[in-house]
Amino acid sequence: MYIYWILLGLAIATEITGTLSMKWASVSEGNGGFILMLVMISLSYIFLSFAVKKIALGVAYALWEGIGILFITLFSVLLFDESLSLMKIAGLTTLVAGIVLIKSGTRKVRKPELEVNHGAV
């Protein structure tokens, strides 16, 4: 089961890298950023598709998108000098609270136990 969480982590990391390289490509010369973006976003969806085999889709997607937005915003401020207003901070805080609620509200599905065949004599 841990492998699926690792795959989700890889999906998040490649999504962040792909989205940041999209911004980098738009402010720099050449096509390297666009190629990196294409590869990373493609890998992100591949990793996510494997992760949802054992992780609930709602949880996986919320974590993928939410953590991605959180780190993309943080790195955009650090790398590209984008602004971080009080309203953005409030939105990110709400996002994190939503992710926590979705994750904590998800129950693990139990597998049905096998019935024992009690034949009548």
UniProtKB/Swiss-Prot annotation:
One of its GO terms (molecular function) is antiporter activity. InterPro entries: Small_drug/metabolite_transptr, Small_multidrug_res, Spermidine_export_MdtJ. GO terms for biological process: glycine betaine transport. The keyword Cell inner membrane applies. The chain crosses the membrane at residues 1-21, 32-52, 55-75, 82-102. NCBIfam families: PRK10452.1. This is Spermidine export protein MdtJ. The lineage of its organism: Bacteria, Pseudomonadati, Pseudomonadota, Gammaproteobacteria, Enterobacterales. The gene is mdtJ.
